[in-house]
């Protein structure tokens, strides 16, 4: 049977005066309900899946359209688009505890964002988290003098957790509709998770309603789950059974995992009923943990008995994290500046210099700097403590200079050398002397300058003469060895100092840069000009 063509079917209807309504198919990412916000298109661009398109060409067109609506090249320059992409990646790699501060303060540029993160890091390193005393002990600390109160405001958090639900309400696990939604594909699962989790934050029994700004932040964390913000098991949150009685089923879906009672220390009288509420996606757990840890802290922003750190019982199952403090019978709210994250906890200290590290591998890598230089260059024999230092040095022999200055197009083999060179264009001199307030573009120049105030001369020759700079000592030693490394390419005459070669070359070039202000005569050396002024123009001041 022949099928009628759509255009042929529409013609009689139009002739009869019947209005024809064309229904456009809604795109997979919901363009029918288009939101003009660039953030919406960014999320759609990051979450777009190949299965949502009819084919590779359609998928490519959809990605191009989403990217264009996100970055808006018709409104932004290339530099602005580049900065936007760099900022997005920088925010992705930042620790989770910075998210609330960034969203609250809203830095205007990448430099302002980096300065804010650096300031928060320094403040967090200065603050120390003091654990509360165990139950039964009488000693107290400065931060443990007051009892925990649910109404205390913690940092920038406006939501105040209240753990006052009746103990009779138990957790029955997720409803069948939740399980059916979680069994769908990853994209539908993410959307279903957001639809269930966001109402929990809006009007949950344990949490008051939050403002729209916090809801937007929550949505950003939920949709960022696929980027791997960290698994739930890596966090120091452990909910005993007695605390799960006070959590709603929707909140269990959010937290995503039930902790066995035997894995943690619980108060006497706790039941042993096991609750099964484990959504399969680890990224959804990590997304919510990123939100809750940022909003309420990780291990210290809890009510009485909530979030106790797991500890292996004698003869119990292995797997407890080494180095964690013993379980406490209370947790205290910390100041705003304190962020209990592993990036601020540095338990591994170098026995040589006392520098702290958050990972043992970083400590081992640092300790190599105190050992012998085991990596040697086959070209010049220079030794290095780390392999990456040797690889950077080998660029000087291979002629690789990948870093280019955008102002003068000068190339460098290392990024640090380029950054120092760019200060000559910007005039930046970040290193200042505390005695005379003179500024320098390099730290080494400041160190050499400060020796003029202290009188320090650490470089000593065999003859007993001392110098404040190593370069001056090297030039002085040539007087003993007779070395003359600087040679004239015209006449072959050699010199021990570079400035003497420069003065000599003026004889061949005829250059006379020193002029007498009285008579206008020119000379190729400053000493000759001074002698001329003494004999011919005694009244005139000498040229310095």
UniProtKB/Swiss-Prot annotation:
SUPFAM superfamilies: beta-beta-alpha zinc fingers, KRAB domain (Kruppel-associated box), Retrovirus capsid dimerization domain-like
Alphabetical list of CDD domains matching this protein: KRAB_A-box (cd07765), SCAN (cd07936)
Region feature Disordered, mapped onto this chain: 157-189
Domain of life assignment: Eukaryota
TM region(s), chain numbering: none
Keyword Phosphoprotein appears in the UniProt entry: no
Keyword Ubl conjugation: yes
Coarse class of the protein's main subcellular location: nucleus
Location(s) in or outside the cell: Nucleus
Gene3D superfamilies: Classic Zinc Finger, DNA breaking-rejoining enzymes
Family of the protein in this entry: Belongs to the krueppel C2H2-type zinc-finger protein family.
Protein name, entry field: Zinc finger and SCAN domain-containing protein 25
